[in-house]
Amino acid sequence: MGEDKETNILAGLGNTISQVENVVAASLRPLPTATGDGTYVAESTQTGLAKDLSHVDLKDVRTLAEVVKSAATGEPVDDKQYIMERVIQLAAGLPSTSRNAAELTKSFLNMLWNDLEHPPVSYLGADSMHRKADGSGNNRFWPQLGAAGSAYARSVRPKTMQSPSLPDPETIFDCLLRRKEYREHPNKISSVLFYLASIIIHDLFQTDPKDNSVSKTSSYLDLSPLYGNNQDEQNLVRTFKDGKLKPDCFATKRVLGFPPGVGVLLIMFNRFHNYVVDQLAAINECGRFTKPDESNVDEYAKYDNNLFQTGRLVTCGLYANIILKDYVRTILNINRTDSTWSLDPRMEMKDGLLGEAAAMATGNQVSAEFNVVYRWHACISKRDEKWTEDFHREIMPGVDPSTLSMQDFVAGLGRWQAGLPQEPLERPFSGLQRKPDGAFNDDDLVNLFEKSVEDCAGAFGASHVPAIFKSVEALGIMQARRWNLGTLNEFRQYFNLAPHKTFEDINSDPYIADQLKRLYDHPDLVEIYPGVVVEEAKDSMVPGSGLCTNFTISRAILSDAVALVRGDRFYTVDYTPKHLTNWAYNEIQPNNAVDQGQVFYKLVLRAFPNHFDGNSIYAHFPLVVPSENEKILKSLGVAEKYSWEKPSRISHPIFISSHAACMSILENQETFKVTWGRKIEFLMQRDKHQYGKDFMLSGDRPPNAASRKMMGSALYRDEWEAEVKNFYEQTTLKLLHKNSYKLAGVNQVDIVRDVANLAQVHFCSSVFSLPLKTDSNPRGIFAESELYKIMAAVFTAIFYDADIGKSFELNQAARTVTQQLGQLTMANVEIIAKTGLIANLVNRLHRRDVLSEYGIHMIQRLLDSGLPATEIVWTHILPTAGGMVANQAQLFSQCLDYYLSEEGSGHLPEINRLAKENTPEADELLTRYFMEGARLRSSVALPRVAAQPTVVEDNGEKLTIKAGQVVMCNLVSACMDPTAFPDPEKVKLDRDMNLYAHFGFGPHKCLGLDLCKTGLSTMLKVLGRLDNLRRAPGAQGQLKKLSGPGGIAKYMNEDQSGFTPFPSTMKIQWDGELPQLKEDF
C-alpha cells in the first residue's frame, strides 16, 4: 500500500514538472504575427527512427519480422499468434509524432481495405447465379460488357499511315495464301483440335452483316454455338422439360457449313449437358432440384430453368477445362511430356513483392484484331478441303468457285443459310437420319468422330490455304480494312514483340518475302491481315511449341486464353461446388493422375458410353492422330495403359431377373463363364509376369477350382466359427468405444465409415497378415481408412467397373494400390516361407488380436501347397482379400439400413431381445434376421458370358442368347422373386437358407459365405444390444443412394461428389452406455 502511494506521488510530480516545462516554453514564444486572426501557426512535428527505438522492444522487432515475412511470402497468417493485435500494440506504443507509426497505421488500413473486394464481383440471387443467354451481366457493374450485340473493341492504335490504295485482296490470296502443295501438320495434330478451335472462334466472333462493327455473339467462352446467342436462339434448342436440350441439336446454323466433325463435337456437348441434368436431378443435392408437379406451371418452369442453367454452367466448365487442359497443352507440346503443368488462368494470386496480382472476373470484350488472328484455314486437311469443295458444289451447283465473285459467294451462302429450317431438329446434318426420339444413331456419330481423330490437319504458314477459300480470305482482308486495323508490326509491338525489320523477318521463304515486298514496299506497311497468317511458322519445341503456328499468333492466342478465362466470373469467383453442386464440380475437374490432367475423355465417354473402352486412345488423346500418339506414349513408357482399337458398339448385357433363371445360369459352368479374369490379371500383373489367372474367380478351368479348394481349406480350420464370432464381437465393440461420441448427451457414431467398414479391414488384415497400423500394431503401414479404400478400389475395379467415364481412373488407381499392398504382403509371406518362425513374425508385428495366429497359420498352410510365395500372394491372397472387405461391409450396412427404415424398424425390439439373450438359438435367429435384411437391401448383379448359343427362360419368356453375349443375373430382383421368397417384402425367419442369392450361387458362390454369415450376424448382435437404436436425425442418418439399371443401388461418397458401389456414411444413435470391452482384447 505504501509503495502504491509513493508511486502516485512520483507520477504526480512528473506531470507537474512537465506542465511547468510547457508553461516556460509557451512564455518564450514570439508574438503571433504570422496570421491575421492573432493565432499561432500550428507546426507539424514528426519524429523518426531514433525516437521510435526508445519505445520498441524485442517483441516488437519479432512482430515486424513476421509482418514482413507474411507480406513477402503471401502465406496465411496464424491469427493464434495474435499478429494483428501485436501490430496494434506496436503502432499504439510509438510516439504520437512518429512518422513510422503513421506509415504502419496506413499499411494496416491498406491491408484491412484490401481484405475485401471493392466493389464485390460475386453476388447472391438467381439473377447472378447463371449465365444470361446473351452473355450480359458477367460484370455486374458493366452488365453490357461483352454481351452479344456489342461493338468489337480495338486493341491496337493504328498510328501508321498507310496508302489508301492497298493491294487487291484476291491478288494477295493468289500471291501469298493459295495452297500449292499440301503439308501435314509437323506434330501430327488431328483435325479434332481445329474443330474445337472452330467452336471457340465462333463462340467469340460472329460479325453482324448489317453492322460489321458489332459481334452477334458474346465475348465469353459460353458455348453459344450450342446454346445460342440470345434468348430466342436458346429457346429453340431447349425442350423446357427437366432442364434438357433437344437431342443432338445445336443453335448455330453456320456450323452446318463446316466439316461434320465440328457439329459432332457440339452434339457431344449437347449429350453431356443432358447427362449432367439427369444426374443433378437424381442426386438433388440439399433439395436444390426437387421436382414439382408439372401441373404447377410456374414452379415447374423454375425447376426446369434451374436444372438447365446449372447444366449449362457445368457443361461450359468442362468446355473450359478441355480448352485449358487438352487444347492448350497440345498447343504448347506439353502432351509430349509427363509434366502435369498447365497454363491455368484461374490460379489464385495475391499481391506480392513482385507486383500486383492479375485481376479476376472483370468481364471481357473481344477485339477486332483477334477476329483476324483466328483465321486458320491453312490447317484444313486434305479430307476437309475435299469436303468443302463438295459442299460448295451442293449449295451452288454448276458454279465454278474460281470464277465466282465475292458478291455472288456471299449471296449464295446467304440463300443456303436462309433455306435451313428454323427448328433445330429439322436441320440436315451430314446426311444422317434421326431416330424416333430425335437423336442420331450413335454408330454414325462415332464413325465421324473416329475419322476426325485419324485425320491429320494441315500445317500453318503461307501458301497453304485451299483455293476454295479464296472468297472467304478476300472478304477477311476487306473486313480488316473496313475496321481500320493497325499493321502487323503495330500488333506485334502491342505484345512487346520486336517489329519485323525486313520482309525476310516476316517469312524467310524468298518467294513470300519478295511477294510481300512487291505488295507492300516496307515491312511496317504489311497489314495485320494477311500478315499474321503469312508470317513464318514456329518450329516444334518440346515442350513449348506444339501448334507450330505463325510467330505473332502463337503469342496472341495465349494472352487471349488468359483474358477469356480469368476475366469470366463463371470460370473464376463463381466456379465453385456451391454453384455447380459437389458432384458436378468433381465430374469435370481434371485429375493429374489421368492423362496428366487432360479431360477430353470425360466428354467422349459420356457422349458415347457404348462404343469406347475406358482406356481408348481415341477418347483420351483425340487432338493428335493415333499413330503419333503411339510414338508419344511409348516414349513416355505408358502406351500399354491404353487401348488402340478402333471404337465399335459394345452390346448391353441382357438382364435376367427371375430367381430360377439366375440360379440356373450361375450353376451352369459349362455354358456360362465368369468374366473377371482379365481384370484380376491386370491388377495382379507384376514385373511382366502374369498372376491371377488361376485364382478361383478368374475362370472356369480346373486350376480355378483348385484355387477355391485350397483357399477354402486354409480359411476354414478347426474351431474357426468360435474364433470368428469372438473376433467380430470384440472388434465391433472396440470400434464403437473408439469412434462413438456424445452430441448434447446423445450417443452417436458413423456406423458405416467407422464401424462396418473398419471391422472388415481388421478381419482381413488379421487373416491375411496385411500391414494394418493400429494401436496393437503401431509398425503397420496403412491406417484403417487407407486399407479400406485400397480394398474397395480393388473390389470395384474387378466386380463393379460399370461407369465407363470413371473406368480408366479406377483401374489405374486400383492397380497402383494393389501393387503397393502386394509388395508389403510379400515381405510377410517370404519371412514365413524362408524361416518358418511364425512366433517371431507374430511378435515382430506386435499383433495381439484374437485372429493373429489364425492368419499366420493360414499362410503357412497355403505355403504347404508347394506354390511359390509370389503365386500365393499375387494369385490367391490379394484377390481373396480384395473380394472380402468392401463386399462384407456393404452387406452389413445394407442390412442395418433396412432395420433402421420405416418398414424394418418394427423388428428392432425383437432383435434387441435376442441379442441380449445370448443363446445359440437366439444367435441362429439373428443370423436369419441378417440374411433377410441383406436380401431386402441387396444390390448385387453377377455377369456371365455365354460360351455357346443357348436359350434361357426368364419369367416365362424365352431369351435366345448368342455365344459371346453377356448376361447379368440381377440378384436384386431374384431376391424379391415371390416364387422363391413368398411375401418377398416381409421379413420371414423360416425361409430356406439355400435359396438366398445375394452371396451368389453355384461353383463360384462366395467362398466366405459361412465366415460372412457368422461375422456379420455377430455384428448385428452387438448393435442389436443397444437400446433404442435409431438413425441420427436428418440426412446424416440416411444412406445416400440412387437406383441404377435393374434397380441396383449406387451410393454416393461422403461429400456426394461421386458414386460408389458401397455405402459410405450413415450415423446412428442409441440410449445407454456401451458394454465393457474384454481387458485382454
UniProtKB/Swiss-Prot annotation:
Q: Biological process GO annotation list? A: fatty acid metabolic process; response to oxidative stress
Q: What is its EC number?
A: 1.13.11.60, 5.4.4.5
Complex and partners: Homotetramer.
- Identify the cofactor(s): heme b
Q: What does this protein do?
A: Bifunctional heme-containing enzyme that oxidizes linoleic acid to (8R,9Z,12Z)-8-hydroperoxyoctadeca-9,12-dienoate (within the N-terminal heme peroxidase domain), which is subsequently isomerized to (5S,8R,9Z,12Z)-5,8-dihydroxyoctadeca-9,12-dienoate (within the C-terminal P450 heme thiolate domain). Oxidized unsaturated fatty acids, so-called oxylipins, derived from endogenous fatty acids, influence the development of the asexual conidiophores and sexual cleistothecia and regulate the secondary metabolism.
Region annotated Linoleate 8R-lipoxygenase, chain positions: 105-446
- Is Metal-binding set as a keyword in this record? yes
Q: Is-annotated flag, keyword Metal-binding? A: yes
Gene, per the UniProt record = ppoA
Where does the source fall among the domains of life?
Eukaryota
Lineage at the top is:
Eukaryota, Fungi, Dikarya, Ascomycota, Pezizomycotina
List UniProt keywords, sorted A-Z: Dioxygenase, Heme, Iron, Isomerase, Metal-binding, Multifunctional enzyme, Oxidoreductase, Peroxidase
**What is the name attached to this protein's record?**
Psi-producing oxygenase A
Which positions does UniProt annotate for heme b binding?
Answer: H202, H377
Active site (UniProt): Y374
**InterPro entries for the chain:** Cyt_P450, Cyt_P450_CS, Cyt_P450_sf, Haem_peroxidase_animal, Haem_peroxidase_sf, Haem_peroxidase_sf_animal, Oxylipin_biosynth_metab, Ppo-like_N
* Family of this protein: Belongs to the peroxidase family.
Entry's pH dependence statement: Optimum pH is 7-7.5.
Region span, 9,12-octadecadienoate 8-hydroperoxide 8R-isomerase: 654-1081
Q: Which reaction does it catalyse?
A: (9Z,12Z)-octadecadienoate + O2 = (8R,9Z,12Z)-8-hydroperoxyoctadeca-9,12-dienoate; (8R,9Z,12Z)-8-hydroperoxyoctadeca-9,12-dienoate = (5S,8R,9Z,12Z)-5,8-dihydroxyoctadeca-9,12-dienoate
Alphabetical list of Pfam families matching this protein = An_peroxidase (PF03098), p450 (PF00067)
